[in-house]
């Protein structure tokens, strides 16, 4: 399922501990929060600290993301048109669906990340777009619910869109706007983000890079339908944050294609 996590770039903490992944048992107080132990895949959180994003040119990254997203929109325009038509013909409601998501949090650069305000969202909020794959009354009660691999709330065409990951195509527009990158941790809704930040140590440090349409966690792990699934994805997300590079992004983009074609992994 992926390689063991290693070579993290970290910052020293007040305790003087380091951040390391390996095959050893779960030993730190943070690791205890990740119980039951995740050892099946050779991944385990041994000791934690602040995970710092690997350095890379923001300008080059931005240009690359805009170019790829723009080209993808042009090439995939016929697919986008067919998907929009299929949604319109098979279910009532809008073609596009938007949700507020939690984006990048740059406060770690000024050491203000943990000087939280009362209504701290954990990152810059933005509106993320998707092709609608659920019934219009899927969340009529207003409560945010985790998406599942076989979600009963999805429409007939929505099931196919999710399996092929075509429902994510409108997020190419989010990339052009600067809300997201092609590659990065998947953004979460504010209510679910707040819950996960409270339950999972280091979860908020995923926000130190822009969220993405696809990511290292998505090509290595299936749909997260429970807290334990999210905990495993956090390991992959933090590895990406620490080792991000343009070459790694290209690799993940190429690895995403078979995930879409053969319906492996998950968003």
Model-predicted regions and their roles:
Residues 1-74, 95, 240-242, 267:
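N-terminal hydrophobic signal-anchor/signal peptide
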Residues 52-136, 246, 251-267:
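A hydrophobic, helix-centered structural microdomain
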Residues 91, 226-229:
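Flexible acidic/glycine-rich loop/turn elements at helix↔coil and beta-strand↔loop transitions
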């Amino acid at each position: 399922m992926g390689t063991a996590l290693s070579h993290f770039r970290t910052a020293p903490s007040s305790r003087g501990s380091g951040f390391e992944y390996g095959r050893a048992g779960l030993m730190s107080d943070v690791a205890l929060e990740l119980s039951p132990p995740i050892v099946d895949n050779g991944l385990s959180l041994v000791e934690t600290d602040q995970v710092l994003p690997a350095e890379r040119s923001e300008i080059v990254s931005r240009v690359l993301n805009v170019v790829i997203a723009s080209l993808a929109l042009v090439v995939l325009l016929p697919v986008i048109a067919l998907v929009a038509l299929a949604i319109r013909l098979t279910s009532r409601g809008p073609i596009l669906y938007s949700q507020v998501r939690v984006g990048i949090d740059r406060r770690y650069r000024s050491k203000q990340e943990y000087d939280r305000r009362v209504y701290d969202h954990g990152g810059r909020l933005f509106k993320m777009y998707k092709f609608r794959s659920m019934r219009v009354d899927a969340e009529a009660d207003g409560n945010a619910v985790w998406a599942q691999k076989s979600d009963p709330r999805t429409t007939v065409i929505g099931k196919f869109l999710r399996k092929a990951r075509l429902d994510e195509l409108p997020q190419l527009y989010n990339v052009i706007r600067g809300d997201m990158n092609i590659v990065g941790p998947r953004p979460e809704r504010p209510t679910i983000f707040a819950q996960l930040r409270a339950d999972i140590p280091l979860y908020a440090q995923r926000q130190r890079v822009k969220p993405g349409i696809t990511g290292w966690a998505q090509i290595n792990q299936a749909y997260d339908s429970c807290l334990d699934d999210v905990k495993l994805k956090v390991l992959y997300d933090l590895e990406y944050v620490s080792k991000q590079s343009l070459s790694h992004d290209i690799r993940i983009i190429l690895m995403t294609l078979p995930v879409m074609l053969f319906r492996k992994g998950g968003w």
